Amino acid sequence: MDPGKEGLPRKPRFSAQQLHVGKWLSPFFFTCAVYFLLWIPDDQPSWVGALVKCLPVLSLVVFLRAVDAGGGYSARLQGALLCSAVGDACLVWPEAFLHGVAAFAAAHLLYLWAFGLTPLQPGLLLLVILAALPYYGLLLWHLPPDLVLALTAYSLALATMLWRGLARGGSTGWGALLFTLSDTTLAWNAFAQPLPHARLVVMTTYYSAQVLISLSVSQSPKLKPN
């Protein structure tokens, strides 16, 4: 040991801000664990199942309110999360499927508003279109006629959100990518072909997407002091 450094205070492993963020994220991880441990069958719709499913996303609203000192970006993310929670609850009941699609479409529009159009990066848009067209072209053959219009509109909102998330980069980009993976897996499993462990893939990527997008608020200078 360097004798000249004896007695000097050690640099903390985590900053106070990181500990503050971690503290307010802990309810998200706890409620995610509850969801996966309970694993309530999705063929038995109930308000308990809906609540357990929504709690991780609602906990992220609390997280954003706790760590952000205010601003339009955080407010739009909170709005998107609340719309997502409504969508989560609706999708528990098959008869409310279109209501769930509408709620998630509203969430994507709020994410789009939050992400903005700068930098534009049209090349990324071209890549998203080239990836989306073959997938949706195949899925289209399996969709019930009465859902084609609604799911086409939803797919456009999702693809645009992916483009803007990737353009923003960082945790936002990863979150947008995982959100898209979650939704495309869900749609293929529901309408085209049953996939092994589809629900696990859908919910793991979905919760990961929401927390990654929420963490993008840490790039803002308006974080609340601890």
Curated annotation (Swiss-Prot):
Residues 1-23, 65-76, 118-123, 164-171, 218-226 are cytoplasmic. One of its GO terms (biological process) is ether lipid metabolic process. It is found in: Endoplasmic reticulum membrane; Cytoplasm. It is a multi-pass membrane protein. GO terms for cellular component: cytoplasm; endoplasmic reticulum membrane; membrane. Belongs to the TMEM86 family. Catalyzes the hydrolysis of the vinyl ether bond of choline or ethanolamine lysoplasmalogens, forming fatty aldehyde and glycerophosphocholine or glycerophosphoethanolamine, respectively and is specific for the sn-2-deacylated (lyso) form of plasmalogen. This is Lysoplasmalogenase TMEM86B.
